[in-house]
Amino acid sequence: MAEPTKNVNIKIGDEELKGRYANLVRISHTREELILDFINMVPPQGTVTSRVIMNPAHLKRLIGALQANLALYEKNFGPTQEAPEPTDGGSVN
């Protein structure tokens, strides 16, 4: 028999409710985790506005959820254009 679904309450503070703007994401990894640095790039400098560290299994689930949500978005609002690669002035490496 399937277990009943449990409701989970999630708290979010006032600062997190504001959100963080990012126009660039830098991804790096170790054997055990992937690190996503969300960056607000205003040349000549970028600022990491948020860092998310995940294990590979959770990141794979996140990718699936992002793909499903993008498909739903495009169904409702039409196709999106992929952002162009940054020019030389936009490099953070």
Where are these regions (language model features)?
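Positively charged, low-complexity terminal tracts
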Residues: 1-93
